[in-house]
Swiss-Prot record:
Belongs to the COMM domain-containing protein 9 family. One of its GO terms (cellular component) is nucleoplasm. This is COMM domain-containing protein 9. Ubiquitous. Keywords: Acetylation, Cytoplasmic vesicle, Ion transport, Nucleus, Sodium, Sodium transport, Transcription, Transcription regulation, Transport, Ubl conjugation pathway. Residues 122-196 form the COMM domain. Scaffold protein in the commander complex that is essential for endosomal recycling of transmembrane cargos; the commander complex is composed of the CCC subcomplex and the retriever subcomplex. May modulate activity of cullin-RING E3 ubiquitin ligase (CRL) complexes. May down-regulate activation of NF-kappa-B. Modulates Na(+) transport in epithelial cells by regulation of apical cell surface expression of amiloride-sensitive sodium channel (ENaC) subunits. It comes from Homo sapiens. The modification N-acetylalanine is found at A2. PANTHER family: COMM DOMAIN-CONTAINING PROTEIN 9 (PTHR15663:SF4). The gene is COMMD9.
Amino acid sequence: MAALTAEHFAALQSLLKASSKDVVRQLCQESFSSSALGLKKLLDVTCSSLSVTQEEAEELLQALHRLTRLVAFRDLSSAEAILALFPENFHQNLKNLLTKIILEHVSTWRTEAQANQISLPRLVDLDWRVDIKTSSDSISRMAVPTCLLQMKIQEDPSLCGDKPSISAVTVELSKETLDTMLDGLGRIRDQLSAVASK
């Protein structure tokens, strides 16, 4: 994620017109979410609370959004790391206030960003049962044990709106297929453990 430009920092200076720290805190919280940026209500609140034009409010919210996203994306968790993002000539008290507010909320924002990222469908439930499948042909009658595996899969919420789509998939596995699958899952587990321990 690209660093902030001089224009972004100039837009952030509009926060000096805020009547209280709570106004700055509220704008930081509201501007983190991408969906909130286009809301007319947020623009109107920003215009009235800071006495700025619509254009200045948009630039400020974009700058705040970019700053908070950058901190969450880079996983900056110390005041020093966040302060280093600001230019030297940036208003000292505003810089300190923004850093304090960001530190208060960065872990929540990271969790929100991770939950909202576009991803592959997720496995939400897994169930199985063992059945005896009988088959008959002219040669002999056979009873073959099989595993019926039912997986419930949730589509990415950002792609399907407010109501996440959950679908069920049922597969039938022979003992040989199940053995191969378990062997492959064991290797995946070993690789994940190796990566996690690095």
